[in-house]
């Protein structure tokens, strides 16, 4: 089954171009009117007095190359089909459209199709009288013995250098020389957990190695140099850094580009950046470019690192602002700092105290919740994410630990409730921890005001309902908690009646085919009908334990 949002395969590249133009922040992109099979994007603010810088290649590497058209970078980009070089006619058309007397530089990634098609177009353009030079970028170091290293993400840095000198009116020889220098001092290496999905691909599964990563996988899914037996971010980054250090000159300041190959989450890219800043390369890194998606391979689950050796003109070119959609501003690696809060601690202050009755209730409730962990997880797996038992068991173990270490104010219920509310936000994940914290915090405040325990618990319930948005009948723990607390208002010492009310409320959730709160609200009626809400069941079991005890 295809893993790609698109309309028609034949319109895919054109649709991609349209989207890029529509969202251009500088409003400086335009299609070149031509044969429908020729897809060229150009600068609207074209200045033919300057050297034109043209790049392109197969689509599927977005934002390359359209995302780098604009003042200070590319003049035009020629877009082929997905992972297919543009035609000779398309490249020649682009040259003719944007090249003036200053000439043009073609920047080409080192793949056979691109070399041949751009190369023949350059020869034809020269025959027509155009001053054309072509630079082939081969920055991939993953296969060091390869006579023709592939052009990958480092190509974007060459765009930046060439565009800088072209924008400032330098002649073609100078633009070419500076771009060649940049290319010869640019080193890239990629890694991926899996290859990419092609549009409309239904049979072939992306290549992947469970528990492993493929070093040097190509930007079209070509096999890499080796499969490594780890997916640990620090180990992967350090291995890549070792290979970059082996290829780089022994000294010299660097800018390093962190490129998302298309399918890596923002969170993972942040972790990768952190690992790079902790790697043996960190002392030489003056500038970071990214993390960002710059040269992708559709949805490939991978990333690449590119290092460029800095000298004065290269550094200035990299740091100069441009008017493109996707060039990220380089930044120096930042120090991780902490700001000390000037506010007084909001933590609950207390003195531990003893109360045998309260201690017995805390022991009973926490033990009940711990014992219910597996049962509630199984119930939650049918209507949620299968972790409610573990969530409440973790909270129960925390409170029980404080009890056993005699670190609870058992003789001051207002402070005890406030402390429980504070701890629950720390040890309970998700919204459940916050809701129960609201419940106990509000109840504790009501006790401070002189209310009795049942009144305080009902106040906690009211605040839980207000902030959480759920009510009785919404298939949540409130379906058991509210009937039980209502029963206690009428009969404060009748725990059996409270349990009966809670159990009846929990059982009513089996008859409900619609949840109005929590994760269950996203499930179908078929998934809910006949299954008791685990939160309601949990509360009913707590009241059952209390009713059957001799603590009441």
Curated annotation (Swiss-Prot):
Annotated keywords: ATP-binding, Calcium, Glycerol metabolism, Kinase, Lipid-binding, Magnesium, Metal-binding, Nucleotide-binding, Transferase
Pathway(s) the chain acts in: Polyol metabolism; glycerol fermentation; glycerone phosphate from glycerol (oxidative route): step 2/2
Gene Ontology terms for molecular function: ATP binding; glycerone kinase activity; lipid binding; metal ion binding
Binding site for ATP: 385-388, 431-432, 468, 476-477, 533-535
Enzyme Commission numbers on file: 2.7.1.29
The keyword Cell membrane appears for this protein: no
GO annotation (BP), single: anaerobic glycerol catabolic process
Source domain of life: Bacteria
Domain DhaK: 8-327
Cross-referenced NCBIfam families: dak_ATP
Subunit structure: Homodimer.
UniProt protein name: Dihydroxyacetone kinase
Species in which this protein is naturally found: Citrobacter freundii
Lineage: Bacteria, Pseudomonadati, Pseudomonadota, Gammaproteobacteria, Enterobacterales
């Amino acid at each position: 089954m295809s893993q790609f949002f698109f309309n028609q395969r034949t319109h895919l590249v054109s649709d991609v171009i349209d989207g890029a133009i529509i969202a251009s922040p500088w409003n400086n992109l335009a299609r070149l009117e031509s044969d429908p099979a020729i897809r060229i994007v150009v600068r609207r603010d074209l200045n033919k007095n300057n050297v034109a810088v043209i790049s392109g290649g197969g689509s599927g590497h977005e934002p390359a190359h359209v995302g780098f058209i604009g003042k200070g970078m590319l003049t035009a980009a020629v877009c082929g089909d997905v992972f297919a070089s543009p035609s000779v006619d398309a490249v020649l058309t682009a040259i003719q459209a944007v090249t003036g007397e200053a000439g043009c530089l073609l920047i080409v990634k080192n793949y056979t199709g691109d070399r041949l098609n751009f190369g023949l177009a350059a020869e034809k353009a020269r025959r027509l009288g155009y001053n054309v030079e072509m630079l082939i970028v081969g920055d991939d170091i993953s296969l060091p013995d390869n006579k023709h290293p592939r052009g990958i993400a480092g190509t974007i840095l060459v765009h930046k250098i060439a565009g800088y000198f072209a924008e400032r009116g330098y002649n073609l020889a100078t633009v070419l020389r500076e771009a060649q220098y940049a290319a010869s001092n640019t080193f890239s290496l990629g890694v991926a957990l899996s290859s990419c999905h092609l549009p409309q691909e239904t049979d072939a599964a992306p290549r992947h190695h469970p528990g492993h990563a493929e070093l040097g996988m190509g930007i079209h899914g070509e096999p890499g140099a080796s499969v490594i037996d780890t997916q640990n971010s620090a180990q992967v980054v350090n291995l890549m850094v070792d290979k970059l250090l082996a290829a780089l000159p022994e000294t010299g300041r660097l800018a390093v580009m962190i490129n998302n190959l298309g399918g890596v989450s923002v969170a993972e890219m942040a972790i990768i950046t952190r690992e790079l800043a902790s790697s043996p390369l960190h002392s030489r890194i003056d500038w970071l470019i990214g993390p960002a998606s710059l040269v992708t391979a559709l949805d490939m689950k991978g990333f690449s690192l590119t290092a460029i050796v800095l000298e004065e003109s290269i550094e200035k070119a990299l740091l100069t602002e441009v008017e493109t959609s996707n060039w990220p501003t380089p930044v120096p690696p930042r120090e991780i700092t902490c700001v000390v809060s000037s506010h007084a601690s909001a933590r609950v202050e207390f003195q531990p105290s003893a109360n045998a009755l309260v201690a017995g209730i805390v022991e009973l409730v926490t033990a009940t919740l711990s014992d219910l962990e597996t049962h509630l997880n199984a119930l939650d797996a049918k209507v949620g994410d299968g972790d409610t038992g573990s969530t409440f068991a973790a909270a129960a173990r925390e409170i029980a630990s404080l009890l056993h270490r005699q670190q609870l104010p058992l003789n001051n219920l207002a402070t005890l409730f406030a402390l429980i509310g504070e701890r629950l936000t720390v040890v309970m994940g998700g919204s459940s921890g916050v809701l129960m914290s609201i419940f106990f915090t509000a109840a504790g405040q009501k006790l401070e005001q002189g209310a009795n325990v049942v009144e305080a618990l009902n106040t906690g319930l009211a605040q839980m309902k207000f902030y959480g948005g759920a009510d009785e009948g919404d298939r949540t723990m409130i379906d058991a908690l509210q009937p039980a607390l209502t029963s206690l208002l009428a009969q404060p010492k009748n725990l059996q009646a409270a349990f009966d009310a809670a159990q009846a409320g929990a059982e009513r959730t089996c008859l409900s085919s619609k949840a109005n709160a929590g994760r269950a609200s996203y499930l179908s009626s078929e998934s809910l009908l006949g299954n008791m809400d685990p939160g309601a069941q949990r509360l009913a079991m707590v009241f059952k334990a209390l009713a059957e005890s001799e603590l009441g």
